[in-house]
Amino acid sequence: MKPFPTIKYATGDATRPVSDGSAVIVHICNDIGGWGRGFVVAISKRWKSPEEAYRLWHAGNGTPFALGEVQFIEVEPQLWVANMIAQRDVRRTGGAPPIRYEALRLALSKVAAFCAEKEATVHMPRIGCGLAGGDWAEVSRIVDDELGAKGISVTVYDFP
């Protein structure tokens, strides 16, 4: 499938985004409070605060911890990590993968609003396509609809 024109692809580490200004690193979290596999390992190696904030959020501190919600953590000046809850549990249920596309759409709409306010670009791995079991064709369509179509620059990193 041909990549969407609003998504740029790069080889590199999504935890080290290439940006001239404000940037948001987005990734998918599950709705059961689990953190420790997948892209979050790379995040935790760079910064402790996204995991700490996620665990506090799951414990009931802050906005509701539910599918479609997003938590923004500033990890460096002009750099945020967006913990997006778009994965139901960590295992397939009834043959369905853990990713929830509608929750991803809702979360990305919140990311778009945040990025518009901060004049930030978005950086990510191929979210939702590893442990969450999603299909990149579907995920990239949602990314394009919710971010690219709203003028938000998106870079997807493939780790070398």
Place the predicted regions along the sequence by residue:
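Macrodomain-like recognition of ADP-ribose-binding/processing modules
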Residues: 1-160
